[in-house]
């Protein structure tokens, strides 16, 4: 699998919103969620080469500011970003990659082998960085992406997810 001239190696927030509206990969193909569930502001690098396994990589960022919606409700007087939102962002990015390389279908998170949380995202943080290292992409009747991910806040690794799985489905009727 190699990139084509229509693919970009980075995407702005406006590009990501276009993906959420079905304007990037087509209406019945991979989409990102809309805000508030869109958990990144930009993709700074995406490639089908490189990364830890030589199969591709994605680097994306979320700017942290104290007025993000989740700080008001998680938790009162102890605001912290829910770790599950960081995990969801890694699934979002893996699904984006599957659409970016040209696979059809709607993305669904299918699982993760192991997740470790070793830090937290507080309202005083500045930037969350997601790094996705592709391990394998199966592009047959079933489209499946397998990857590892690291999430860091202000340069410190705080989450590790191994064996993320996302599938693309041309029909989700039986799902």
Curated annotation (Swiss-Prot):
Q: Which family does it belong to?
A: Belongs to the thioester dehydratase family. FabA subfamily.
For this UniProt record, the keywords arranged alphabetically read as follows:
Cytoplasm, Fatty acid biosynthesis, Fatty acid metabolism, Isomerase, Lipid biosynthesis, Lipid metabolism, Lyase
What would be the name of the gene that encodes this protein? fabA
Pathway connected to this protein: Lipid metabolism; fatty acid biosynthesis
User: What GO biological process terms are annotated to this protein in UniProt?
Assistant: unsaturated fatty acid biosynthetic process
A Pfam match is FabA
| Function (record text) | Necessary for the introduction of cis unsaturation into fatty acids. Catalyzes the dehydration of (3R)-3-hydroxydecanoyl-ACP to E-(2)-decenoyl-ACP and then its isomerization to Z-(3)-decenoyl-ACP. Can catalyze the dehydratase reaction for beta-hydroxyacyl-ACPs with saturated chain lengths up to 16:0, being most active on intermediate chain length.
Supply the InterPro entries for this chain.
FabA, FabA_FabZ, HotDog_dom_sf
Q: What is this protein called?
A: 3-hydroxydecanoyl-[acyl-carrier-protein] dehydratase
Q: Which residues are the active-site ones?
A: 74
Where is the protein localized?
A: Cytoplasm
Quote the subunit structure annotation: Homodimer.
EC annotation? 4.2.1.59, 5.3.3.14
Superkingdom assignment:
Bacteria
A GO term for molecular function: (3R)-hydroxyacyl-[acyl-carrier-protein] dehydratase activity
Q: Which reaction does it catalyse?
A: a (3R)-hydroxyacyl-[ACP] = a (2E)-enoyl-[ACP] + H2O; (3R)-hydroxydecanoyl-[ACP] = (2E)-decenoyl-[ACP] + H2O; (2E)-decenoyl-[ACP] = (3Z)-decenoyl-[ACP]
What lineage does the source organism belong to? Bacteria, Pseudomonadati, Pseudomonadota, Gammaproteobacteria, Oceanospirillales
Q: Which GO terms describe its cellular component?
A: cytoplasm
PANTHER family given in the database record: 3-HYDROXYACYL-[ACYL-CARRIER-PROTEIN] DEHYDRATASE (PTHR30272), 3-HYDROXYDECANOYL-[ACYL-CARRIER-PROTEIN] DEHYDRATASE (PTHR30272:SF8)
Q: What Gene3D superfamilies does this protein's entry cite?
A: Hotdog Thioesterase
The UniProt entry lists the main location of this chain as cytoplasm
């Amino acid at each position: 699998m190699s990139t084509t001239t229509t693919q970009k190696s980075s995407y702005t927030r406006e590009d990501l919103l276009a993906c959420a509206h079905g304007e990037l990969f087509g209406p019945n193909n991979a989409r990102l969620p809309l805000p508030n569930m869109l958990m990144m502001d930009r993709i700074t690098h995406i490639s089908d080469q490189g990364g830890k396994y030589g199969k591709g990589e994605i680097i994306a960022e979320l700017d942290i500011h104290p007025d993000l919606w989740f700080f008001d409700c998680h938790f009162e007087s102890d605001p912290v970003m829910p770790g599950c939102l960081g995990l969801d962002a890694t699934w979002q990015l893996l699904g984006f990659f599957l659409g970016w390389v040209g696979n059809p279908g709607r993305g669904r998170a299918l699982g993760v082998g192991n997740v470790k949380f070793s830090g937290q995202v507080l309202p005083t943080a500045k930037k969350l960085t997601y790094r996705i290292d592709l391990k394998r992409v199966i592009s047959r009747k079933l489209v499946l992406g397998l990857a590892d991910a690291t999430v860091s806040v202000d340069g410190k690794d705080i989450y590790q997810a191994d064996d993320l799985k996302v599938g693309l489905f041309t029909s989700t009727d039986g799902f």
